[in-house]
């Protein structure tokens, strides 16, 4: 079914209360007060003569009044900036917040040691103290924000300072003042003294001059290098126009310098035992030998000629290798005593003979 007519709204009756809407009205009133307090601040008030803001005027090509004036001095500009900085700044206070109070700067009072003489009375002292306290309070109000130097009142610091002053005064008293000569107090020399001093300086200058000249001569001698010049007979070789020439100078001749005789060949060493061409030479005796047997014979003959040295003297490393004993591991070199007998080439002739003198003597016996 369609309802053509709307049903009327039914309102329920409520019991009235004494505190009904009390909180809401209080909140609304607080909001209105905060709103008025915010918009009535000094920062938001319009000033009658606002220097910072001026309405723009439609004026063309206008110059300021101070266009032709000189620029202000920097000191004056600095003073104006300082005054502008010192002006109190306007700040916005938002609703629901309280303005912050300025903190007063604490000033430190200079404490000084006071000396109280014995003649003053206690009543007068109290009066003087009160006056001094009043003056100090006034000075504190005038000197807000200024820094005051603090002095220590400890007795130890004062005593140390007094000791330093006394020590400094004692040092200054003991030090002797520097006596400076006056310009007019210089001693004037007589004519005789001046002549004597001139003679002494002349002698010293001559000695120094001699030393300098001697040093220069030594340096010059060292600088000059004398090359040795050959002045004997010379043969010079010249090549000119495709021809070679020999020039004999200073007593040189063709026959004297160019000899046609052949140089004889050096004689070949022969083994003293076998007579064959020697390839080796004994380092101890200096005799040439060709074979190992010849070397053994030379050493044995050498040991036989030197009586009593066979036991004291070794045959040597070379002899050991030839005998096939090999080198000793660690052997000290034996010292050979000096003897007046010398092994000559004449003794080598005995090796060629089949029998020596000793053997013939033994046969005769």
UniProtKB/Swiss-Prot annotation:
Which intervals carry biased composition (Basic and acidic residues)?
118-132
GO BP terms: namely: cell differentiation; flower development
Instruction: Name the residue ranges with Low complexity bias.
Output: 342-354
- Stored SMART domains: YL1_C
Q: Where is the composition biased (Acidic residues)?
A: 48-74, 133-144, 355-365
Q: Which keywords belong to this entry?
A: Coiled coil, Developmental protein, Differentiation, Flowering
Q: Enumerate composition-biased segments (Basic residues).
A: 99-108
Enumerate the InterPro entries for this protein: Vps72/YL1_C, YL1_N
Q: Name one Pfam family in it.
A: YL1
User: Out of the domains of life, which is the source?
Assistant: Eukaryota
PANTHER family linked to this entry: VACUOLAR PROTEIN SORTING-ASSOCIATED PROTEIN 72 HOMOLOG (PTHR13275:SF4), YL-1 PROTEIN TRANSCRIPTION FACTOR-LIKE 1 (PTHR13275)
UniProt lists the family membership as follows:
Belongs to the VPS72/YL1 family.
Described function: Component of the SWR1 complex which mediates the ATP-dependent exchange of histone H2A for the H2A variant H2A.F/Z leading to transcriptional regulation of selected genes (e.g. FLC) by chromatin remodeling.
Q: What is this protein called?
A: SWR1 complex subunit 2
From what organism does this protein derive? Arabidopsis thaliana
Gene name?
Answer: SWC2
